[in-house]
Design a protein with these regions (language model features):
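Short, hydrophobic secondary-structure boundary micro-motifs
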Residues: 17-18, 99-101, 166
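Hydrophobic alpha-helical connector segments
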Residues: 60-96
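A short secondary-structure junction motif
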Residues: 8, 55-59, 63, 94, ...
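Amphipathic alpha-helical packing segments from all-alpha helical-bundle domains
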Residues: 105-131, 137-152, 182
């Protein structure tokens, strides 16, 4: 029924226009069969998304568990981040349903659910070994930026019909994590990110202290 749901979203261009009747007709099933599994269309969508989120949580955790030292080594060897191929293979295998739900006619809230899940999985691992002075707003915005960027790349890949192979896309996403301003224009901006970030955080702390004194 999930493939039928995806096909109906594609056919109508809008999840809100999908009906139980259209899904059962496309799937060659009876309404009784549908209602023996789901309460309504919203329940079908919810269960589908919950299953995807559960599957993705484990795959994202595998990627997040990679140590920076190991990641640097794989990049030197022009290999993708460990775990990224498996993650993309999941998207490829479930591309029909994921493209429908994450596309323009799908469920806008689903993208945010994925971002929240990734944040939950990655945040704890990202804190390991971090300079305590970088915690707070700077770290939160950095994580939000990184997650939104990676999820955005995945959505672009889906929307483009996943033309690039999994191995190629895994390497692209790995490299994108380390692209600096100017890298693509032979004019790399090589500046001290930790020092800059800590200076920004110190300004924030000073501003908050000044506000408390007023």
């Amino acid at each position: 029924m999930r493939d039928a749901l995806a096909s109906e979203v594609e056919a109508t261009g809008d999840l809100a226009r999908v009906t139980v009747g259209s899904i059962t007709d496309r799937a060659g099933l009876t309404r009784r069969t549908f209602y023996s599994h789901y309460h309504d269309i919203a329940d079908l969508v919810s269960q589908t998304e919950d299953d995807v989120l559960r599957d993705l949580r484990g795959l994202v955790a595998d990627v997040a568990s990679v140590r920076l030292e190991d990641l640097y080594e794989t990049i030197d060897e022009l290999e993708p981040c460990p775990g990224s191929v498996e993650l993309l293979e999941y998207f490829k295998a479930n591309g029909h349903v994921l493209t429908a739900l994450l596309g323009q006619g799908g469920d806008p809230a689903f993208v945010e659910k994925i971002k929240v899940m990734v944040h939950e999985v990655v945040a704890g691992r990202a804190l390991d070994g971090i300079d305590a002075r970088a915690l707070g707003a700077f770290f939160d915005y950095y994580l939000t930026f990184a997650i939104s960027a990676e999820v955005g790349v995945l959505l672009r890949w889906l929307a483009g019909g996943m033309r690039e192979g999994v191995d190629v896309m895994a390497r692209i996403m790995t490299l994108l994590m380390f692209v600096r301003p100017g890298d693509l224009y032979d004019n790399t901006m090589d500046f001290n990110i930790p020092a800059y970030g800590l200076a920004v955080m110190q300004r924030l702390i000073n501003t908050e202290e000044d506000s408390d004194d007023e």
